[in-house]
Each structure stands twice: as C-alpha cells, then as structure tokens.
C-alpha cells in the first residue's frame, strides 16, 4: 500500500490554513470523480499530505467535511446574485434575475449541489449558515422592498423568500435529474416558470392568498380591458 508522504510540521496558528487545504482537497476529489464515493478521510489525507488523524482534528467525520465543502461552494452564490441584481432598480425584476442565477449556479456544478441538499444532519448545517448570512439576506431585502410597495404584508417576507427558493430549487433539481427534457436554450423554460412564480405571487399578495380561481380570472379580464370597456387586443 502506498504510504502517505510526510508533511512538514505546520507553524503555530496554521490550523485554519490546514483546514482550508483539506476542504480544497475534498472539493477536488468530488469534482474529479463526480460523486463522494472517492472522498474518504484517507484519500483526502493522502491528497493533502497528512495522516488521517490530522483530518479529524478539524472535521468530526466525512459528513462534516462534505458540509464544509458545500458551504464554501455556496459562499459563491451571493456573488452570483450580486452580478445580476446590482443596478436593477425594480425589486420584482431583481428577484426574478436572482432566481435564474440560482438555477444557473446549481446546474453548473451538479455534484456539489446534490451533495449540499443530501446532507441530513440534525440542526442547521454550515450550508444553512452561509446562505442565511449572505445570499438569502439579499433575497429577503428584495422581498422586503416588494412588501414596502404593498405587494405583500411585511409579516409574509420570510414565507415569500421560502416560496421563491422552493421554486428555484425545484426547477434546478428537476433539470439535474432529467437533463434530457426540452428545457430550451439559455434556461428559457426555467425563466418562464420563475417569472410566473414571481408575478403570480405578487398578484396573490395584493388580492389575497385565498383568492378563488374564478375571482382571479375576473380580475385578470378586467385588467386586460381597454379604457373604453372593449377587450384589449
């Protein structure tokens, strides 16, 4: 069996640096192999050049290491949101663009995305902490702007953020699971679905979540009519 080359003793205070090296090595193995079967503590230790016990000083087990890997991955999501949202004044359009950016982000690195949502450890994960502190704060701020415009009650902001996330996550997960389906070029179907969710949710936010289908149909027809009372064509 191939031995692990000895790594020189790290200087005092370099534990955080070693943890970053461990996360990088695990990320590389994930991307190289396409799943986590190759990401054993021994394999990661070999890649970094340390002994397996050194890994356990920083991560309790493989699941904890994978959680840290996925958390680092999701740190990039806020930057993706900023790239599409900064400079967009309309909060509704901003919410839509962030939803599309989420789907693009998820489908660009499927192995990391799948593993991030496969973890089932009790309590908040590092991924949850990262999202709550960055990307989701940006979404919540946008939804709060919509609430200030009267599209939702302010008390519904958290619920609406969860609904928008569920929609984006759902379409991203289905695109990853069924890539052979006709999704259209440049995420066309994903954009159509997310646009329907954003516009539909703001409409219901104004009319009331318990609005019946017939009442919504009547309201939509009324909005479609021209000022003289004729149907708008």
Task: Tell where the protein language model's regions lie, with residue ranges.
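Short amphipathic alpha-helical elements of helix-turn-helix/winged-helix folds
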Residues: 25-32, 105
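Amphipathic alpha-helical interaction segments
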Residues: 21, 43, 97, 101, ...
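Hydrophobic alpha-helical connector segments
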Residues: 82-112, 136, 164
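Helix-turn-helix
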Residues: 21, 32-64, 68
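Generic hydrophobic, amphipathic alpha-helix propensity
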Residues: 18-27, 44, 69-73, 77, ...
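Amphipathic alpha-helical linker/stalk segments
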Residues: 72-96, 127-130, 140, 144-147
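Hydrophobic/aromatic-rich alpha-helical bundle segments in the mid-to-C-terminal region
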Residues: 124-129, 133, 148-196, 204-224
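N-terminal intrinsically disordered/low-complexity leader segments
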Residues: 1-17, 28, 205-233
């Amino acid at each position: 069996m191939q031995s692990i080359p000895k790594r020189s003793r790290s200087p005092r205070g370099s534990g955080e640096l070693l943890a970053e090296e461990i996360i990088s090595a695990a990320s590389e193995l994930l991307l190289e192999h396409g799943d986590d079967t190759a990401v054993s503590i021994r394999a990661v230790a070999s890649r970094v050049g340390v002994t397996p016990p050194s890994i356990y000083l920083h991560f309790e087990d493989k699941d904890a290491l994978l959680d840290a890997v996925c958390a680092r991955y999701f740190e990039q999501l806020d930057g993706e949101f900023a790239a599409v949202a900064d400079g967009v004044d309309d909060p509704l359009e901003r919410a839509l663009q962030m939803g599309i950016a989420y789907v693009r982000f998820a489908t660009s690195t499927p192995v990391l995305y799948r593993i991030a949502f496969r973890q089932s450890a009790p309590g908040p994960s590092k991924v949850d902490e990262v999202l709550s502190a960055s990307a989701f704060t940006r979404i919540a701020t946008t939804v709060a702007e919509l609430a200030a415009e009267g599209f939702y009650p302010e008390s519904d902001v958290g619920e609406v953020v969860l609904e928008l996330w569920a929609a984006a996550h759902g379409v991203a997960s289905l695109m990853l699971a069924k890539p052979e389906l006709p999704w259209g070029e440049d995420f066309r179907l994903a954009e159509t679905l997310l646009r329907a969710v954003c516009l539909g949710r703001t409409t219901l936010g104004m009319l009331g979540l318990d609005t019946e289908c017939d009442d919504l149909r009547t309201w939509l027809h009324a909005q479609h009519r021209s000022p003289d009372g004729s149907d708008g064509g």
